Every structure is written in structure tokens, then in C-alpha cells.
Regions:
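Bacterial Sec-dependent N-terminal signal peptides
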Residues: 1-12
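Loop/turn elements at helix/coil->beta-strand transitions in domains of secreted/extracellular proteins
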Residues: 12-17, 47-51, 78, 131-136, ...
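Second-shell loop/turn segments in exported
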Residues: 25-31, 54-57, 108-114, 232-239, ...
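A long, amphipathic alpha-helix that forms part
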Residues: 28, 235-261, 274-315, 494
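Short, structured active-site-proximal loop/turn typified by the sulfatase FGly-forming signature C/S-X-P-X-R
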Residues: 29-78, 135-139
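Secreted, luminal/periplasmic, and some membrane-associated catalytic domains
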Residues: 62, 85-110, 119, 124, ...
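His/Asp/Glu-rich, glycine-adjacent segments
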Residues: 75, 83-263, 272-279, 403
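Substrate-binding rim/cap in mid-to-C-terminal beta-strand-loop elements of soluble/periplasmic
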Residues: 345-386, 456-498, 514-518
Length: 518
């Protein structure tokens, strides 16, 4: 036997802590590295088995699809979570991927469950292996990251409600620990402290020197008024949310008896490292530098608390990001380098007119456009006894004539296996039960304008986001690995260390650095 990064007789960890940072950027860790202390990001990078980058094998990544992929070890084509929302054309409205009318919320009005995720998660398999004895919990800013990282069989998943700022959950999960109840209603609750919370620079302004593009010398200052509708959604995009996550996570470490059972326990924690919602149209800000600086301190506090309560030697730490980054930066006047505007509503209207010219005007042949996909009126096509594949192909040929369209893929082509290196990302990132009839890929620099003054325009950028992956604790020796690994390899690696089956849709092998090679 050749032992790689593990001790020869490595024990199963008593606790698994999955730390996922929404919108984490590896390049920002590098840019801001000199402002960090020794026991946060630097501790992870120096004491862990560090993979330079993980790759998600599909396009249009968002929070829901990223978290489902990381925790199931499979892509959306299997786990079914293609995005945070989908469009219900029958009722003409957006619907959360988590929506489930059969369950009500605790400390929230939302009706959520994980039932639309078709694959099992790491936590589900741990529950099955332990016959329910392991405790599995998740804490996150948003319901998507909380519920999808917890899974179907978890004890509980908690997120901050957008309306009241309390830690919310769904009655799908039976566990509501007393200390969460006490926290929500006590002097430590967010509402009790909100008036005193002001976000200003933590460091002197000259220390925020990673970007030479900040033009003003005015320190930022943000306050939060509970009476405004966007109070908590905005707060959830500041460093305060990570401190709130830590406050609750420390309650779980203190009272949850993690690591004391005969079977391992699991705690999934999500932090936020994206732009502030109030200035989404700006990049290269002092705010993002301050977010990382404060997150470094929060990581230090959390890792130290785990070490003190359970011991890092008894804990497997899994640290990574969500593989995407949201920016609404707009081009200054006169600086639009290439591209133009793509108007989905006009596209749908013209396509419908084209199909009416061919197949008649007795019906509307197109339902609508959502998330770069066009949905045809399949009932009308079936009633007219027309061939769906032929109509999809004709529609695709017509759409390719539009300015700004790079490629159009049909649902039939993906179902029939007619994909190539360029279109496999559409097959991986969509699910056959939810996919549109046509998937449109626009050229970089083009702007999607939905002709809705309430919506921001979306500028197409095809940049990859560097997303590190770190395994630390539990006898793992420090090493840096510079090959790219797949996001679907994370879950089977964690289950391998736990000595349990991988999630049921996971087809990847565990990373070989964490296995014993014969």
C-alpha cells in the first residue's frame, strides 16, 4: 500500500463541517492575502490539502444549482435543480425551486422543501448509514443554500428570513432546537441589535489597495432600517451576515453535542463573499475588500471554536465556493466594446409570427422565454398533430439569424445524445423534465434587455471563476494540488472519508489524494 495524504490508520472523523462561501473568488483571496491574519484563509491554505480550482461542468451557474451539485456529486441533469427559480407558464409567474405547498414555515411565510432535488446528498447518505443516529444540520443566509446542503433526511436547515431577519426553517424538517428558538426571541436576536449595526471600513482607507480603480477617498457607510422592505436582503450581502452565521453556528457547537455520538455528525455552513446589493453595479470596490477582510476573521473564529469543542484532529473541514460571481456592472457611456441588445419579448413575438406563417394562425406556438430558453406550446403542436422535432429544428434555424446569437440547441438534440464539446454544458446544466424546447447562447458583451424597467439588464460574460477546494483536519497532510478537479468529485470524496456510500446520482470517483492507492 502507498499512503498519500492520509495517516496509515486514519479514523473516521467525529464531525464533518462543510464551509461553502457563496460567490467565493480565488483570485480575490490572492489579491487581498496581505490583509489577512494567520488563522483564517491562511490557515486553510497552509494546513489543508488545497486544490487550486474546481470546475462546474455547466453554464448559468447560480446558488441553487451550485449547492445541489456540490452536495449530491451530480449535475443538474440528474439532481434536477437547474436554478433557484423556474417559470410556471400556466400561471404566468416565477416559482422557487424549493416551493412546496405541503409544508409551512417556522419564522417565515415561505413554503419550502427539498423534494424537487431528485438526488440524495452527503447528509442523506450519512443518515442512512447511521440509521438516523448522526445529526445533520445546515445554516446559510438563504433558503436555497441551507436546504440543498442539508438534503432530504437532515435534522434541520436554517436561513435568515427576508421579511423578519429571524432564523427560519420549514416544517419539512422535524428539528427546531430550543437554542434556535431562544436565539430568535432573545436579546441576541438580530432585530434587537439592528439599530447599532453600521457598516463602515474596518481598515484605514489606504489599506484597501488591491485595486487601483477606486477613484474617491470617501469612506462608505451603510445602515439598516427594519421598516424598509429590502433591509434584510441588503444586510445579507454585507459582512454582517457572516457574523450572524457564526453566532448561530457557535450555538450549534455549544449545545448540539456534535462529535459525541458513535456516528459522525455533519454541519454545513454557508458564508457570503459577493457584492453588496446596494452597489451591484460597481466592481473593484473597497466594500468587497472589506468583506473578505472580515470573512477572514469569521473563519478564524469558527475554526478556533471547532478546534476547542471537537478538535480539528477529529473533524473533517471541507472548504470551497459556489463557482460563480454576480455582477451588474454597467458600461460607461461610449465604452461598449462590442455587442448590442437582445430583447427576449421581441424574439418570442417574431418566432411566433414565423411559425404562424408556416403552420397557421389558429394558435400561439410559443409560450415564452425564461433563463435563455424558449418554451413552445406543446399542447397546440400535439393538437395540430405536428412533429415537435421538426418545429424545434425550424425554430432553431430561425433564431440563429438573430444578431448576437452564438448558438441554439434543441431539446430533442440533447435527448437524442446529439451534443458535442460546445453543447454538453447545456445537457449537464438542464433537466429533461424542466428544459425549454430551445436553448439560446448569446455572444459575449451582448445585453439581455427584458423591456422591464424594474429589472436590471444582464451583460453576457463568459469568465471562469477560480474556486479553491480545501480539505483540512482529520489527519490530512498539507499539500497544494494544481490540477483542476470537478465539482461533482467533492461529495464522493467526503463520503469516502466517512466510509459510506456516495450520493445515489454521483458517478465520480473520490479524489485520489484522499484515498489509499494499491
Amino acid at each position: 500500500l502507498v499512503v498519500t495524504n492520509l495517516e496509515a490508520q486514519q479514523r473516521t472523523p467525529k464531525l464533518v463541517v462543510c464551509i461553502t462561501v457563496d460567490q467565493l473568488r480565488g483570485d480575490y483571496i490572492e489579491y487581498f492575502y496581505n490583509t489577512f491574519g494567520e488563522r483564517g484563509f491562511k490557515r486553510l491554505m497552509n494546513e489543508g490539502l488545497v486544490y487550486n480550482n474546481i470546475k462546474f461542468e455547466f453554464s448559468d451557474i447560480d446558488q441553487a444549482s451550485a449547492f445541489a451539485t456540490l452536495f449530491t456529486g451530480s449535475n443538474p441533469c440528474f439532481h434536477g435543480v437547474t436554478g433557484s427559480k423556474y417559470y410556471d407558464f400556466e400561471n404566468d409567474k416565477e416559482v422557487s425551486i424549493l416551493y412546496d405547498k405541503d409544508y409551512i414555515g417556522n419564522y417565515t411565510r415561505e413554503n419550502y422543501s427539498p423534494k424537487k432535488m431528485f438526488s440524495s446528498t452527503i447528509g442523506d447518505e450519512l443518515k442512512i448509514a447511521s440509521k438516523g443516529r448522526s445529526d445533520v444540520y445546515a445554516i446559510a443566509p438563504d433558503a436555497e443554500s441551507a436546504i440543498l446542503s442539508a438534503g432530504h433526511a437532515a435534522n434541520g436547515a436554517f436561513w435568515m428570513d427576508d421579511m423578519n431577519g429571524k432564523w427560519a426553517t420549514t416544517t419539512y424538517y422535524k428539528g427546531l432546537p430550543w437554542y434556535v428558538d431562544r436565539y430568535n426571541n432573545g436579546v441576541e436576536s438580530l432585530s434587537a441589535r439592528l439599530e447599532q449595526m453600521v457598516w463602515t471600513p474596518t481598515l484605514p482607507l489606504d489599506k484597501y489597495n488591491a485595486f487601483p480603480y477606486v477613484l474617491d477617498d470617501i469612506p462608505f457607510k451603510y445602515t439598516f432600517n427594519e421598516k424598509t422592505n429590502d433591509c434584510f436582503p441588503k444586510l445579507k450581502t454585507t459582512p454582517f451576515i457572516n457574523k450572524e452565521i457564526n453566532r448561530l453556528a457557535l450555538q450549534f457547537l455549544e449545545y448540539g453535542a456534535f462529535g459525541t455520538r458513535s456516528c459522525p455528525d455533519m454541519l454545513s455552513v454557508t458564508y457570503y463573499a459577493g457584492n453588496y446589493k446596494g452597489i451591484m453595479n460597481k466592481d473593484y470596490t473597497r466594500e468587497i475588500q472589506d468583506t473578505y477582510y472580515q470573512l477572514d476573521k469569521d473563519l478564524e473564529q469558527f475554526l478556533d471554536a471547532i478546534d476547542k469543542k471537537v478538535g480539528l484532529a477529529n473533524t473533517l473541514i471541507v472548504f470551497t465556493g459556489s463557482g460563480y460571481y454576480t455582477s451588474e456592472e454597467e458600461y460607461a457611456d461610449g465604452l461598449l466594446i462590442n455587442g448590442g441588445e437582445f430583447h427576449p419579448k421581441r424574439c418570442v413575438a417574431l418566432l411566433n409570427m414565423y411559425l404562424m406563417a408556416i403552420y397557421g394562425q389558429q394558435s400561439s406556438w410559443v409560450k415564452g422565454f425564461y433563463n435563455n430558453q424558449i418554451y413552445l406550446n406543446r399542447k397546440a403542436i400535439e393538437d395540430a398533430k405536428l412533429d415537435l422535432r421538426t418545429i424545434q429544428d425550424k425554430a432553431a434555424e430561425f433564431l440563429m439569424e438573430f444578431s448576437g446569437v452564438q448558438h441554439v440547441t434543441t431539446d430533442h438534440a440533447l435527448l437524442a445524445g446529439e451534443w458535442n464539446e460546445g453543447t454538453v454544458k447545456f445537457r449537464q446544466g438542464t433537466h429533461h423534465l424542466k428544459r425549454g424546447d430551445l436553448i439560446i447562447e448569446l455572444q459575449p458583451g451582448w445585453i439581455i434587455n427584458n423591456d422591464n424597467p424594474k429589472e436590471k439588464v444582464k451583460i453576457i460574460r463568459n469568465n471562469a471563476v477560480i474556486t479553491p477546494l480545501v480539505f483540512m483536519g482529520n489527519g490530512i497532510k498539507p499539500e497544494h494540488i494544481y490540477r483542476e478537479v470537478k465539482a461533482t468529485e467533492v461529495a464522493p470524496t467526503v463520503t469516502h472519508v466517512l466510509r459510506i456510500r456516495p450520493p445515489n446520482a454521483s458517478q465520480s470517483l473520490p479524489l485520489w489524494e484522499l484515498t489509499i492507492k494499491k
